[in-house]
């Protein structure tokens, strides 16, 4: 729907209802908890109640006034106008964080988000949403001050701790020399050395591992034949950012030790053959015994902790993404709702024109064109209805549905992806299938995920090989409906076959690993099963069942 049609419909609604704010979507605009305004040429056309309350203005007081009222200075008003005057010619949405002045002269910090009503007709103006973040800013300032105080305290404590550590290291060195002199305590020392839950190694200036305990052998491993050196170890080492570290450049090697000690350096270790990966926290001290420099290093296995940290990071990222999707769903539903009435009005006008033309000679061609316009408006209304149903919150209700129609509706949502990736969709649907009791939105979500995965799996294949097959059949006992999605993509690695449905497991660089987990939960809640199988050398087939 164009911006002119929206403006025309607004004028008609106001004329019919005497500008009553309780009519149609005016109620939504006026009573939404978000501060919203409509601008044209940097002047207010209309503001909702929340916007006027936020900045201390009476109802209608800002109408037709310049937005200069909200800027702290003339300079800021002029500068922002010059910098962003042509912003929407290159971008769809504007978002900024800035101070805004209220009517009483007080200043509050806000997040300002705006976009054109109609990108094809900028003269209609733009819509803006303002969020008050003053309390958040004050909290940030308080937190920053607290952090600065804490940093000073930590620095002081660190200096004290460094003194204690140096003193402790001297005591340890003294005790070690005493133990070497006292040979009668050697046996006790060796037992303690090998019973420690952390790996310990002693390395000389040439990189030879002179001594290591059992835990070190289990964590790092050692060659079967001496001499044992770091160069002979089969492992590959890397930092937390993935940068490889040569064995001779390991932080605890003598050549790289700049100070007497290093503390809790995290480093990754991967075996060349098994590709098994571990994470270690390494601390070391530089000692001089009998005139020879040696390094004593302690290795702690932190693999489990690193996995937990990664899972927490993925969970946090997913919660953030779901929050954005939630907001987008609300906006999509509101847009579908607001565009519905203009479509119905346009459809009624066209149908009226068509009825009048039926009795006019020579108007058959015009009547046919109007019929096509009516058909396209019906299709637009149906698309809006599907979008609204798909994104709105709903209580899962299972009703008898034609599974073929559910599949077709899902493909309509993915038509853009299908054409963009040059994918050929091969439908193998049984005619007139029996009705299946299901929650349409949830099953569409499953199909959406499986079809999208199939399209992405074939993105690097030759265009003629990008064939996606979707089909269904009734089970041999007649009690369930089988639906499958089969692609001819790169396939799934052997190591990933058994973990395909594990939460947070993914083979995609930007994936989160929860899509198939959610799909399986939905299918199981319907009393069905979701399974995966390979199809030849390449390709994958996902199949799920639903009770009839």
Curated annotation (Swiss-Prot):
Q: Name one Pfam family in it.
A: PAS_9
Where the record annotates domain PAS, the positions are 20-89, 185-256
After translation, the protein is modified as follows: Autophosphorylated.
Q: Does the keyword Secreted apply?
A: no
Show the InterPro entries listed in the entry: HATPase_C_sf (IPR036890), His_kinase_dom (IPR005467), PAC (IPR001610), PAS (IPR000014), PAS-assoc_C (IPR000700), PAS-like_dom_sf (IPR035965), Sensor_kinase/Photoreceptor (IPR052162), Sig_transdc_His_kin-like_C (IPR004358)
Record field: catalytic activity: ATP + protein L-histidine = ADP + protein N-phospho-L-histidine
Any idea what this protein is called? Sensor protein TdiS
Taxonomically, what lineage is the organism?
Answer: Bacteria, Pseudomonadati, Pseudomonadota, Betaproteobacteria, Rhodocyclales
